[in-house]
């Protein structure tokens, strides 16, 4: 008997005995898994991709994989703010990592875990869920203060441990960041993600008096690219695959697009700079990223094991997301912060017992801004009227259902992108545009915005973007 049928049977019995249905229905638990900087170059999306993610695939087999899931903003703070508050950047005014005006709203601002707490849940968490606070140590207290009954802070890339030579262990010096940003710890137990998952495992092994909202924020594969040595054995440097990087790729890109690509140009330029001394420096960086992403996947596996062992899987909603993607040398970028596909396309999976069909796939473009209202509906909680997103439950029930809500991405005020099943349309604050045909150009090498034969396509996408942005 499925979890949904059990709840229906229990409800019927309670009604016959005179107990209200609301009291009879068992609220589902929520396992909320965040991953930092995980792009789409994984086996979750294509078995031929180099980054091995068997546990993401294991999770997708239980529910619905959104093959076109996108962040609202390709930056840690604004993306997480959108997810955790339900407000997109046009509402929150959180466009960049340095923007924190949203917290000035005070009591009127109700975060996602806080909303669950207000409706009878216990909310606990660990790791990186909100963006880091002052000094980069721990989640922003303005987000955590009212959100959790208990929270174990994210305290950095790893616990205190030995410092290894960055060049010898994977990358040449990049400014003053060599040893701290491009090597890895020798022992898994020194990884902060180990602590995060261990906390979640302990919570899942406990007896609960209330339904639980449990969040686990996995920091990898965010810089620094640490992973246990045994993980690197799966990614030998001689087999490291680089993304395609045609020369002069940015020649047809507007100035603002180039500037966004080079937001942290020191990373890309220093990798190239060191090539005469180490021709494989870019390969080493990509190798380190791949190993870090693989390690993050293994942490997801441990979370699923703990949930299964707890016996609560049939009554637990699971949502997994990455805050944004990541460039690995493509588009002259080794970070995020652009409006191109690789910086915005992310793993996004929802498992909702009794609602999602195991192994289902939804190809509709959607954004993570929809997580807040979706979890409320799945949990039977009243909707929050001022959410900017929309519940994905219709797509969870039927992945081919009509979905009229456009997938909009923003990077900085006035710079927006619209993704459809075929097109990525970008418009910057100065009016300059880009258009890419993903049916024929998945790496976005040819900007079609200046091609008159695509005038009708651009006009239609421009109108959709105008309507979507004007609503905020």
Indicate residue ranges for each PLM-predicted region.
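Formylglycine-dependent sulfatase
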Residues: 10, 15, 23-428, 432-433, ...
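Bacterial N-terminal signal peptides that target proteins for export
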Residues: 1-10
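Glycine-centered signal
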Residues: 2, 22-23
